[in-house]
Amino acid sequence: MKRFILSIFLLVSCLALAACADTEANAEQQMPKAEQKKPEEKTIHVQKKEDDTSAWIKTEKPAKLPILMYHSISSGNSLRVPKEEFEAHMKWLQDNGYQTLTPKEAYLMLTQDKKPSEKCVLITFDDGYTDNYQDAYPVLKKYGMKATIFMIGKSIGHQHHLTENQMKEMAQNGVSIESHTIDHLELNGLSPEQQYNEMADSKKLFDNMFHQETSIISYPVGRYNEETLKAAKETGYQMGVTTEPGAASRDQGMYALHRVRVSPGMSGAAFGAYIESMK
């Protein structure tokens, strides 16, 4: 008798549970779409590629780009610009709407005659001095500026020059590390094979150190010849910069681009007038 009563109880319970389930299902089907639970969607962040120039401005004439040339951010000779003056230069660029470029962006601007902003500039430093990290880098971060340091391969970690860790930190924060050869020798005095090795070894060093395609080289002391230009192309660089004065343009040759030397003694206003004269 007890088993019979227990069986009846279990049967009634099952029927009640089934009825509840049907009620919940019907209620969810009748719920307005806005109230129905949706599977959680994952947000996908799409990072705009550096080589996407679809929104860039087409230039009416072949693009011209001021490539600024600094060395040490200190005082003492014509290659050294004091920190206070350097900051005045960066402030002027920001106040006047200039966009600073990476080497890749500079290459695209010069080869496609398109630019990401009405006013663009490429900031470069030769040799890779410690003060580029201690004094220039904080200013660049303060004003949101990109820059490029042409580092001498053999000088990494040596006195007054950047360490690998310093360069890697900067590389994560808008500063590109590019080639100034291995030994900083005047290339026009070397054999074609020596020139090739200086450039190839430097590119390999920085490619491996920063997991990048090192794309631009600065010729030591601005010395170069036709063999230099040939070697720069053969070793895989996209651009080479010289110390020839003026704004860079494609008609100079992508391996013989001019630069704008920034000397000490320039106030922000004087610097600005100098840059504006390059248009």
How does the language model describe each region?
Residues 137-145, 162-179, 233-234, 248:
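Acidic (Asp/Glu)-rich catalytic clusters
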Residues 6-14:
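Hydrophobic helical h-region of N-terminal Sec-dependent signal peptides
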Residues 1-4:
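Positively charged n-region of N-terminal signal peptides that target proteins for export
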Residues 67-69, 78, 99-103, 141, ...:
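Short, well-structured secondary-structure segments
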Residues 29-124, 130-131, 189-279:
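C-terminal active-site subregion of NodB/CE4 polysaccharide deacetylases
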Residues 15-19:
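C-terminal motif of bacterial Sec signal peptides marking the signal peptidase cleavage site
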Residues 178-193:
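Substrate-binding clefts and substrate-entry loops adjacent to catalytic sites
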Residues 21-23:
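Bacterial signal peptide processing site
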